[in-house]
Amino acid sequence: MSDILKFGIPKGSLEDATVDLFAKAGWKISISSRSYFPGVDDAELNCKLIRPQEMGKYVERGTIDVGIAGRDWVRENDSDVVEVCEMVYSKVSRRPVRWVLVVAQDSKVQRPEDLAGATLSTELVGFTKRYFAERNIPVTVEFSWGATEAKVVDGLCDAIVEVTETGSTIRANNLRIVCDLMESVPVMIANRKSWEDPWKREKIETIATLLKSALAAEGMVGLKMNAPGDKADAITKVLPSQKAPTVSHLYNSDWVSIESILNEKEVRSIVPALLKLGAEGIVEYPLNKII
């Protein structure tokens, strides 16, 4: 049994968001611009910066024990790994990305079958080949080094498979989405032998739990206040909460303390109602984790 867990931090667009998420979960990761080996304030962790496109193969080989990458790249490499959990976050939003089949706006193509014999361009070559092969649709799939949208506009290919969140860039280039091929979110993946190691599995599960709790706390705040005891029922009815607000009696008083967790955006509309119902000493505080 090893007392060191080798963790792959995704280099690139997810890098800063991942480091911030670890900080909220309780780990401080320090990354130097001249090093691929980040420092971390945990003697049991050894972090490495790895491109998400390659994370799956290194986890599968056991070069690293666990890492975070988009599910799209795990599927692209057909990696034989354990998917520990989803980690729905990105540098922009918390929505999944979509890999979509795209053609020119004036194309006659309405479904994947209409592309039989066509040439497609994409970064996701392996997945795209398997997708069409499974449906017995003969196509040629070429790797794209970038500017993929321009290739179908310039007639360099018949269609593309491209990643998008909203589809706005695709529409702006006078292109049309035929259908979605895959939805992807960041996932934590583990090497199968590492997952079977009791110490490593417990460490991985601890990290996953705390990272997910930090994600759950995003946009949430705690609200605490005092109120007359006879107003407690009315106040708790207007307070949203995961289960029910916490109500406790103040020492030697007929007043109570009320505490609840709610979405930060709800505070501005709820506080005036709380004041009208007799609440006093209202305190709003940030949350790092919800477990």
Curated annotation (Swiss-Prot):
Transmembrane segments: none annotated. Pathway: Amino-acid biosynthesis; L-histidine biosynthesis; L-histidine from 5-phospho-alpha-D-ribose 1-diphosphate: step 1/9. It catalyses: 1-(5-phospho-beta-D-ribosyl)-ATP + diphosphate = 5-phospho-alpha-D-ribose 1-diphosphate + ATP. It holds the Pfam family HisG_C. GO terms for cellular component: cytoplasm. It comes from the Bacteria. Keywords: Amino-acid biosynthesis, ATP-binding, Cytoplasm, Glycosyltransferase, Histidine biosynthesis, Magnesium, Metal-binding, Nucleotide-binding, Transferase. Its EC number is 2.4.2.17. One of its GO terms (biological process) is L-histidine biosynthetic process. The keyword Amino-acid biosynthesis applies. Its cofactor is Mg(2+). CDD domains: PBP2_HisGL3 (cd13593). GO terms for molecular function: ATP binding; ATP phosphoribosyltransferase activity; magnesium ion binding. Feedback inhibited by histidine. It is found in: Cytoplasm. Belongs to the ATP phosphoribosyltransferase family. Long subfamily. Catalyzes the condensation of ATP and 5-phosphoribose 1-diphosphate to form N'-(5'-phosphoribosyl)-ATP (PR-ATP). Has a crucial role in the pathway because the rate of histidine biosynthesis seems to be controlled primarily by regulation of HisG enzymatic activity. This is ATP phosphoribosyltransferase. It comes from Geotalea daltonii (strain DSM 22248 / JCM 15807 / FRC-32) (Geobacter daltonii).
